[in-house]
Amino acid sequence: MVPFFTRERFGRPQFLAGCLLLAFLAQCLWLVGKGARPGTLDVSEIYRLERGAALWQGRGSGPDANVPVPVPGLKNETDSALAPENGGYDAHHSPLWYLIASAPLHLRQVALQPENIRSLHWLAGAPFLIFGLLLGASLWYVARRLFGNAGGYIALVLYCFSPGILRASALFSAEPEGGAAWGAFGAIFTAIAVAHTLYAPREVILWNWRRILLLSLSLVLAVGSQFSLVVVVPLALAFMLYLAPTRRIAAFVIWIVACAIALLLWYASYFFHARAFWQGMVHGSFLGISWPAYTMPGAYHQVLAQLGQASPALVVALPVALITYFSWRRARYFGNTAPLLVAVLFLALAIGTPHYPGLGFQFMAVPFLFVFVAGIAADLLETRHRQITLAAILGLLVASAAWNLWELARVA
């Protein structure tokens, strides 16, 4: 039997990546602590916990599953500002989003009272801290497999010191998009990984059952957390068919099986209530693009400005990476092209949906841009200008980390 704890699995690269993720976790915990000050109240956070708790208690049925119960001691701000229309069904999220958000509250009973705001904030942030760590680990794994150790480190450092990623993982004045982002990222790259294994001389379904389950979980997490991420479903199929041109039937079968399992898991988030599931689909907004937004220059400026706020390092790194990609033929291969295409699609959807879910699409694009930038940087490190490139990359990463830590200190 091959031992699990081998040097290949747990060596220096894994140790360094783990240290970076610990630094990421420390920053997130700092932000969670600052956001949990007594007297502060995030109405949307209370709403998510309240509605999720009602779903857990009612098992997805009854009036409490759709309409939140008023919090004692608080005004009905949730009803006026956040209560979804369409008979109580959320147009953008399935019950899975609320169930995940309130899972810690289900495991550790804390009353939804004003005096428990600090404890409730820590509980609300716990699932998304985990998603933030998982997305970072997945990002490092994918970038390292595609571009080597250098690409993995560059992508992970950009991720760990990204203000937008930190805010979303710590729920610091940000929507909880970590689960949707991890699901979308996992769906795309798991589909790519599955396609690469189709040429192995083994039975398709049995050999790929682990990846099929992972693809199913990624799809249900993405679409269940944000309905408009249904776009990753056909996108995953497109990558699979492109990468396995002589095994397209097998790729399609795997995709169908993964979608069927994901649909079953999605149905389970409604506690197998067919009527609730059907009404959720009927009242869901799966695209909702505002076509006139594409003719408004302000929409483009807004997306670019928010992208720079999510990761200031991208303001410098992304233009350089794009110029290199389009001017250097060697850089235009699938490993660089795939994350760029996905990021461009998400940013285009963000422009067409200026409010929500546009903000979610912008957040989803950031990890894919990190992979793209890391790939171009790794390619440049293999040229005869390695020393200059290395100095520029290190300078950018150190400056990005220092600026982010300075901004964190200012939060105090």
Placement of each model-derived feature along the sequence:
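Membrane-interface helix-loop-helix junctions at transmembrane boundaries of multi-pass membrane enzymes
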Residues: E8-F10, R144-L146, P201-W209, A244-I254, ...
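Short helix- or helix-capping micro-motifs
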Residues: A23-F24, A155-C160, F189, L219, ...
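Transmembrane-helix signature of polytopic, membrane-embedded enzymes
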Residues: A111-R118, L139-S162, W182
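Transmembrane-helix motifs of polytopic, lipid-linked glycan transferases
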Residues: R118, W122-L146, G186, L322-S327
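Membrane-interface transmembrane helices that cradle and orient dolichyl/undecaprenyl
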Residues: R144, A187-I212, A222, A331, ...
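Membrane-interface alpha helices of multi-pass inner-membrane proteins
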Residues: A155, I205-Q226, F346-L349
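Short acidic/glycine- and proline-prone juxtamembrane loop motifs at membrane-interface regions
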Residues: A170-G179, G358
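Transmembrane-lumen/periplasm boundary regions of multi-pass, lipid-linked membrane glycan transferases
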Residues: V233-A331, H355, A402-V411
